[in-house]
């Protein structure tokens, strides 16, 4: 397996749990992405040249970092992992770029947060494997070109719209990860359970998958918690009934909504009659950062039809009222006869 080097792991990345797939053949779901990536990787191997630069976008927890590791393993090359928020100076980025060896991979997470001045250092690095540095100050300042070894930059982002067009256009390979379906989530849970040594029935794995917000990272977390409940009860295998009891105790409903999701929807319904309401107002009421609400909670609820984004603000849908069993409030907020519901 190719070696991996992580910068500031205590702040930016979870330790490898052994649950991440290490090869393309082990990755479940995202078929179109995998099929295309397999071709790109094989072509780079055949040419014995660096893979073109890769931009991977999509919601959190879908496998962006995992895919970077897989590409590294498939190519048999070293992977250096960092995150854009920890790169604050041009010298930091220059040190990173000059430390990357021939055909190696530099992975930058949250690349949309990279400062525009630092982006400008990346442009010649990505195009010509060269960085331009200014040495000295004032009239004695000189521009020095430092050659780099051919390398692959893999950028990951949850907000591709915030990446400048000049930077985005320099990624020859652009991949978008989407939420997983229930069957894919079930297979991910079954795979993880085998690695963890947890005996689990198919319908239990499906139940965990359905409540994991279509996100593998969450599925693995929930599987471990279900394992805790199962072991404490002395069960030999995980059954659906145990999962249902455990999820009720953890406050996770059949769509995967937790207490914060319900608090956000409740805020919209109780304080703003279902909306429209601005994200900032919601954040103040529930005591959470706007970015966290938008990336972690709202994006999923929009995807499954509980929240609509409109020019005037966020609106709770009829489905949201039904999920919270608050159709009486829906009829009152929308001036409809409650007997119809």
UniProtKB/Swiss-Prot annotation:
<feature type="binding site">
    <location>
        <position position="314"/>
    </location>
    <ligand>
        <name>DNA</name>
    </ligand>
</feature>
<feature type="binding site">
    <location>
        <position position="61"/>
    </location>
    <ligand>
        <name>ATP</name>
    </ligand>
</feature>
<keyword id="KW-0238">DNA-binding</keyword>
<dbReference type="InterPro" id="IPR008824">
    <property type="entry name" value="RuvB-like_N"/>
</dbReference>
<keyword id="KW-0234">DNA repair</keyword>
<dbReference type="Pfam" id="PF17864">
    <property type="entry name" value="AAA_lid_4"/>
</dbReference>
<feature type="binding site">
    <location>
        <position position="65"/>
    </location>
    <ligand>
        <name>ATP</name>
    </ligand>
</feature>
<keyword id="KW-0963">Cytoplasm</keyword>
<dbReference type="GO" id="GO:0006281">
    <property type="term" value="P:DNA repair"/>
</dbReference>
<dbReference type="GO" id="GO:0048476">
    <property type="term" value="C:Holliday junction resolvase complex"/>
</dbReference>
<dbReference type="InterPro" id="IPR036388">
    <property type="entry name" value="WH-like_DNA-bd_sf"/>
</dbReference>
<feature type="binding site">
    <location>
        <position position="64"/>
    </location>
    <ligand>
        <name>ATP</name>
    </ligand>
</feature>
<feature type="binding site">
    <location>
        <position position="65"/>
    </location>
    <ligand>
        <name>Mg(2+)</name>
    </ligand>
</feature>
<keyword id="KW-0227">DNA damage</keyword>
<dbReference type="InterPro" id="IPR041445">
    <property type="entry name" value="AAA_lid_4"/>
</dbReference>
<keyword id="KW-0067">ATP-binding</keyword>
<feature type="region of interest" description="Large ATPase domain (RuvB-L)">
    <location>
        <begin position="1"/>
        <end position="180"/>
    </location>
</feature>
<feature type="binding site">
    <location>
        <position position="170"/>
    </location>
    <ligand>
        <name>ATP</name>
    </ligand>
</feature>
<feature type="binding site">
    <location>
        <position position="180"/>
    </location>
    <ligand>
        <name>ATP</name>
    </ligand>
</feature>
<dbReference type="InterPro" id="IPR004605">
    <property type="entry name" value="DNA_helicase_Holl-junc_RuvB"/>
</dbReference>
<dbReference type="GO" id="GO:0016887">
    <property type="term" value="F:ATP hydrolysis activity"/>
</dbReference>
<dbReference type="GO" id="GO:0005737">
    <property type="term" value="C:cytoplasm"/>
</dbReference>
<dbReference type="GO" id="GO:0000400">
    <property type="term" value="F:four-way junction DNA binding"/>
</dbReference>
<feature type="binding site">
    <location>
        <position position="20"/>
    </location>
    <ligand>
        <name>ATP</name>
    </ligand>
</feature>
<feature type="binding site">
    <location>
        <position position="66"/>
    </location>
    <ligand>
        <name>ATP</name>
    </ligand>
</feature>
<dbReference type="GO" id="GO:0006310">
    <property type="term" value="P:DNA recombination"/>
</dbReference>
<protein>
    <recommendedName>
        <fullName>Holliday junction branch migration complex subunit RuvB</fullName>
        <ecNumber>3.6.4.-</ecNumber>
    </recommendedName>
</protein>
<dbReference type="Pfam" id="PF05496">
    <property type="entry name" value="RuvB_N"/>
</dbReference>
<keyword id="KW-0378">Hydrolase</keyword>
<feature type="region of interest" description="Small ATPAse domain (RuvB-S)">
    <location>
        <begin position="181"/>
        <end position="251"/>
    </location>
</feature>
<dbReference type="GO" id="GO:0009378">
    <property type="term" value="F:four-way junction helicase activity"/>
</dbReference>
<dbReference type="InterPro" id="IPR036390">
    <property type="entry name" value="WH_DNA-bd_sf"/>
</dbReference>
<dbReference type="InterPro" id="IPR027417">
    <property type="entry name" value="P-loop_NTPase"/>
</dbReference>
<keyword id="KW-0233">DNA recombination</keyword>
<feature type="binding site">
    <location>
        <position position="217"/>
    </location>
    <ligand>
        <name>ATP</name>
    </ligand>
</feature>
<comment type="function">
    <text>The RuvA-RuvB-RuvC complex processes Holliday junction (HJ) DNA during genetic recombination and DNA repair, while the RuvA-RuvB complex plays an important role in the rescue of blocked DNA replication forks via replication fork reversal (RFR). RuvA specifically binds to HJ cruciform DNA, conferring on it an open structure. The RuvB hexamer acts as an ATP-dependent pump, pulling dsDNA into and through the RuvAB complex. RuvB forms 2 homohexamers on either side of HJ DNA bound by 1 or 2 RuvA tetramers; 4 subunits per hexamer contact DNA at a time.</text>
</comment>
<dbReference type="Pfam" id="PF05491">
    <property type="entry name" value="RuvB_C"/>
</dbReference>
<comment type="similarity">
    <text>Belongs to the RuvB family.</text>
</comment>
<comment type="subunit">
    <text>Homohexamer. Forms an RuvA(8)-RuvB(12)-Holliday junction (HJ) complex. HJ DNA is sandwiched between 2 RuvA tetramers; dsDNA enters through RuvA and exits via RuvB. An RuvB hexamer assembles on each DNA strand where it exits the tetramer. Each RuvB hexamer is contacted by two RuvA subunits (via domain III) on 2 adjacent RuvB subunits; this complex drives branch migration. In the full resolvosome a probable DNA-RuvA(4)-RuvB(12)-RuvC(2) complex forms which resolves the HJ.</text>
</comment>
<dbReference type="InterPro" id="IPR003593">
    <property type="entry name" value="AAA+_ATPase"/>
</dbReference>
<keyword id="KW-0547">Nucleotide-binding</keyword>
<feature type="binding site">
    <location>
        <position position="309"/>
    </location>
    <ligand>
        <name>DNA</name>
    </ligand>
</feature>
């Amino acid at each position: 397996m190719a070696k991996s080097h992580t910068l500031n792991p205590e702040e930016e990345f979870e330790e490898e749990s052994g649950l991440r797939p290490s090869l393309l053949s082990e990755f479940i779901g995202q078929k179109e992405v995998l099929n295309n990536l397999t071709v790109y990787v094989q072509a780079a191997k055949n040419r014995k040249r660096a893979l073109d630069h890769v931009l991977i976008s999509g919601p959190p927890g879908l496998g962006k970092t995992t895919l970077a590791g897989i590409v590294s393993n498939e190519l048999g090359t070293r992977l250096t992992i960092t995150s854009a928020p920890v790169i604050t100076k041009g010298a930091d980025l220059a040190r990173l770029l000059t430390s990357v060896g021939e055909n190696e991979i530099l992975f930058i997470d949250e690349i949309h947060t990279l400062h525009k001045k630092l982006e400008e250092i990346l442009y010649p690095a990505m195009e010509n494997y060269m960085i331009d540095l200014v040495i000295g100050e004032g009239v004695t300042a000189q521009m020095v070109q430092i050659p780099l070894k051919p390398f692959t930059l893999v950028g990951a982002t949850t907000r591709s719209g915030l990446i400048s067009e000049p930077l985005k256009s320099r990624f020859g390979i652009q991949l978008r990860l989407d939420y997983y379906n229930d069957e894919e989530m079930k297979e991910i849970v079954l795979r993880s359970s085998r690695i963890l040594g947890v005996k689990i029935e198919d319908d239990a794995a499906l139940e965990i998958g359905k409540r994991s917000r279509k996100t593998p990272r969450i599925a693995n977390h929930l599987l471990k918690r279900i394992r805790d409940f199962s072991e404490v009860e002395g069960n030999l295998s995980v059954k659906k009934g145990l999962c249902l009891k455990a999820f009720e105790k953890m406050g996770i409903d059949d769509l995967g909504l937790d207490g914060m999701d319900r608090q956000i929807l409740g805020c919209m319904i109780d304080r703003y009659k279902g909306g429209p309401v601005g994200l900032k107002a919601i954040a103040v009421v529930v005591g959470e950062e706007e970015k966290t609400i938008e990336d972690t909670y709202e994006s999923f609820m929009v995807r499954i039809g509980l929240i609509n984004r409109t020019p005037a603000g966020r609106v709770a849908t009829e489905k949201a009222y039904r999920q919270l069993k608050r159709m009486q409030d829906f009829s009152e907020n929308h001036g409809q006869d409650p007997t119809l519901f």
